[in-house]
Design a protein with these regions (language model features):
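Residue-level detector of anion-binding/catalytic polar loops
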Residues: 72-73, 106, 143, 184, ...
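Short, solvent-exposed loop/turn segments at secondary-structure boundaries
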Residues: 85-89, 119-124, 157-162, 226-229, ...
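Glycine-rich, proline-tolerant flexible connector loops at the mouths of alpha/beta enzymes
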Residues: 77-95, 150-155
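Histidine-acidic metal/acid-base catalytic patches
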Residues: 2-47, 54-70, 194-307
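Active-site acidic/histidine proton-transfer and metal-coordination neighborhood
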Residues: 10-24, 38-40, 60-67, 97-109, ...
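Residues that line or immediately flank small-molecule/substrate-binding pockets and catalytic motifs
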Residues: 50, 78, 114, 149, ...
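Charged helix-capping and loop-helix junction motifs
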Residues: 89-94, 126-131, 160-171, 230-238, ...
């Protein structure tokens, strides 16, 4: 075979990645060898979380931009311009469902409900609000909703375990309600003292509900092992991943130029048979959004040897 400049560069890049980067994706039956470059024919699926990028888009713009950039899923954040809220009428909900279905675009919803308050009236308000939001999700064809834990006292505080148990019990009630509607409840790795995998694991244990899932949010502690609870200190990415791998239903992505070990995470997800979406959740709205989405997708695929 004649060696072209492209083949040479591809082969060199893959060889270097295999040596230097942990979690390098090795050849499989789904991968096709092309001139020494192993092409991943089954990459993970990319989506958009309308945190800042997309916050000012209406539904038509979301569909147009996601189709143009080949994103397969959108997580619609509450209060943003697309207006997918519990105030929608039955006819409006049916219209939202039809528009996304016709576009071939999967959707989830992102709420801000949380379950740590010691005020029982406030806690019940959040639980009931979650159930109302789950009904909205079912009506518009969403596959799941995002919720928060959203805070626990520091270790050593005698109320810590009580709050963790309260969060777990509340989430369990919501998860059962959601399952009856065909909608997943996904608690995000987020909040004060709850933005790490071991604490999310503890919450899942307290919930003891097979219908409760989680969102992997890419906290630095995932790979540094810093700031984790007693008994988990220094735990690495793979060990933390294994704690929750059967409960991950969504992943939030940050900028790919960060220090987070993306290639290793993508490899772990692939090996675990992850079928969900990875949604970009970037903090800069000032960029040229469509161009950024296209470039992000290139980096996302390149880190999986999928282009």
């Amino acid at each position: 075979m004649t060696t072209t400049r492209r083949n040479f560069l591809q082969t060199a890049a893959v060889s270097a990645a295999a040596v230097v980067l942990p979690g390098f994706i090795t050849p499989s039956e789904q991968q096709k060898e092309q001139g020494g470059f192993v092409l991943n024919k089954n990459p993970l699926k990319l989506g958009l979380m309308t945190y800042l990028v997309g916050r000012s888009w209406d539904i038509d713009t979301i569909i147009k931009n996601c189709k143009e950039t080949k994103y397969e899923h959108v997580q619609l954040r509450t209060t943003h311009a697309h207006g997918v809220e519990v105030t929608l009428t039955a006819a409006q909900r049916a219209d939202v469902k039809k528009r996304f279905k016709d576009a071939g675009l999967a959707i989830s919803l992102a709420s801000a409900f949380q379950y740590h308050s010691t005020d029982q009236a406030e806690l019940r308000k959040n639980i009931d609000g979650t159930k109302e939001f789950l009904q909205l999700a079912a009506d518009v064809g969403a596959i799941g909703i995002r919720v928060f834990p959203n805070a626990v006292p520091k270790e050593g505080d005698k109320t810590r375990e009580k709050i963790l148990a309260q969060i777990g019990k509340s989430l369990s009630e919501c998860a059962t309600f959601g399952n009856n509607l065909g909608v997943e409840v996904r608690v995000e790795e987020h909040g004060q003292g709850t933005a790490n995998i071991p604490v999310i694991t503890q919450i899942l244990d307290f919930a003891d509900n097979p219908y409760l899932y989680m969102i992997w949010n890419n906290s630095n502690s995932d790979y540094t092992g810093e700031g984790l609870p007693k008994g988990y200190e220094g735990m690495g990415l793979e060990a933390q991943f294994n704690l929750v791998k059967d409960r991950i239903r969504n992943v939030h992505l940050r900028e790919l130029f960060s220090d987070y070990p993306w290639r290793q995470l993508f490899s772990l997800l692939s090996k675990a048979g992850y079928k969900g979406y990875l949604d970009i959740e970037l903090s800069d709205e000032s960029c040229e959004a469509v161009r950024m989405m296209k470039n992000y997708r290139v980096g996302f695929l390149a880190l999986q040897n999928a282009m």
